[in-house]
């Protein structure tokens, strides 16, 4: 068991809603001598945050105490400046999208994109997986064509070059894509940019690019994609949403209608669904039900 000082134990007790199971005894690696930093690092690791996220929390807690002049175990850090985020407005920001993207359907083909756009889903994403460059180009163009005449906002997952060429509304990229994407070209083309995140360190990294929105998750267990981090849960999602309040936030991962109340309570304005639509016998009816539940 990780040895905690008294204040670290108090932080853990006060923020049990953010706790995830801890496997083994996490190593305590300190980058600073500051007592507040060390206390917060202990607490964050005990709550199950991975090392890089625990470091972010610890540094932010130290900055919070330096800024306010007081240490309060109840005051989980959520001030952007304490995490080193730049103030808004920003000259280098990507084009804005609606603060609430509503129901956000992640779909495998252009055919699905067209069906959900015509069903009134406000935001759709084409997540088309293929190693055939020509097939990708055709599918992206077909998705752009499929949303014409509807109010749906179309994001293209991964394929940013094809999204630019086809004139999509935006592109969504994962953290791994940030190493290779030409963000200057995406911005110059006027596309909106959505970025995935799975914890504090990745949110801070995403913020450096001033994207149009930030997706946060996975909130609940999902079988659709192998995740590097454990499901974050609604407690952490609420903390992430408070920190990233200047962005439209999108909750993703294992979400269905039964979870809407928990998601809404976090303050996140949008939620992404996959199987809650594509696995249903009547996807259009399922989409209508989900939109009505989210709006209720």
Tell where the protein language model's regions lie, with residue ranges.
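Hydrophobic faces of well-ordered beta-strands that scaffold small-molecule active sites
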Residues: 4, 21, 26, 99-107, ...
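Acidic (Asp/Glu)-rich catalytic clusters
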Residues: 114-120, 144-149, 164-165, 184-188, ...
């Amino acid at each position: 068991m990780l040895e905690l000082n008294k204040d670290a134990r108090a932080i853990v007790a006060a923020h049990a809603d953010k706790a995830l199971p801890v496997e083994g005894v996490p190593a305590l690696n300190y980058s600073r001598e500051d007592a507040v930093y060390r206390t917060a690092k202990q607490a964050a690791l005990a709550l199950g945050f991975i090392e890089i996220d625990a470091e972010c929390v610890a540094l932010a807690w130290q900055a919070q105490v330096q800024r306010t002049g007081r240490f309060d175990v109840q005051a989980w850090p959520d001030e952007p400046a304490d995490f080193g985020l730049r103030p808004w407005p920003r000259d280098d920001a990507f084009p804005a999208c609606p603060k609430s993207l509503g129901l956000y359907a992640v779909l495998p083909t252009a055919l699905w994109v067209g069906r959900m756009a015509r069903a009134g889903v406000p935001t759709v994403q084409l997540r088309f997986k293929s190693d055939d460059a020509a097939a990708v180009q055709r599918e992206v163009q077909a998705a752009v064509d499929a949303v014409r005449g509807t109010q749906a906002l179309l994001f293209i997952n991964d394929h940013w070059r094809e999204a630019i060429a086809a004139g999509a509304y935006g592109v969504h990229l994962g953290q791994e894509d940030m190493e290779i994407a030409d963000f200057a070209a995406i911005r110059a083309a006027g596309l909106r940019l959505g970025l995935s995140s799975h914890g504090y360190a990745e949110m801070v990294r995403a913020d450096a690019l001033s994207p149009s929105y930030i997706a946060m998750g996975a909130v609940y267990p999902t079988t659709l994609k192998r995740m590097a981090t454990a499901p974050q849960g609604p407690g952490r999602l609420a903390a992430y949403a408070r920190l990233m309040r200047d962005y439209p936030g999108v909750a993703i991962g294992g979400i269905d209608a039964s979870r809407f109340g928990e998601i809404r309570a976090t303050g996140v304005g949008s939620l992404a669904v996959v199987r809650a639509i594509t696995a249903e016998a009547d996807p259009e009816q399922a989409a209508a039900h989900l939109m009505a539940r989210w709006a209720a």
